[in-house]
Amino acid sequence: MVKVTRNFAMDTLPEDRFFIEKAIALAYEGMRKGAGGPFGALVVREGKILGEGHNQVIGDNDPTAHAEIVAIRNACRDLRHFQLEGCTIYCSSEPCPMCMGAIYWARPERIVFATSHQDAAQYAQFDDQFIYDELKLSREERKIHAAQLLREEGLKLFAEWRGMDGKRLY
């Protein structure tokens, strides 16, 4: 099997620099007002900013209020749609595992970021490596205990969902 290596520096567009600079400015804004860590993000389609956000974990006491998720929520609310086809998400830093999950669910076309997750660990003390490591382990090996209970009841819920008319898949 041949390993494909992409040169992401060549995957950028002329307007990317403008929007990355804006994401970094949002990160400074949130950080300086004490809302959270040094992270900012934008959702852009066809040169128009649809949603933006900075990290608000501390200000909102919400561990999910990362810049990317705030920007996605704002864009989806304003678009009145839960997916971001044709959009680019610009981030001051490479998204963490939680944010990558949200980004994949939102289905944008691309992501552009300034610093890597390794940079965030080395220079800003935001180290997500333990999450990447945990996700590779079985449920039994993970640090946070996970127990399965009432599977049959859960399957009944899924059966009703499958039989529903008019549901919107995502």
Name every feature range the model reports, one short phrase each.
Residues 57, 91, 115:
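Residues that line or immediately flank small-molecule/substrate-binding pockets and catalytic motifs
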Residues 50-57:
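Short beta->alpha transition motifs characteristic of CBS
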Residues 35-39, 85:
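Short, basic and Ser/Thr-rich N-terminal targeting/leader segments
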Residues 61-65, 69-106:
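Helix-adjacent hinge/juxtasegments
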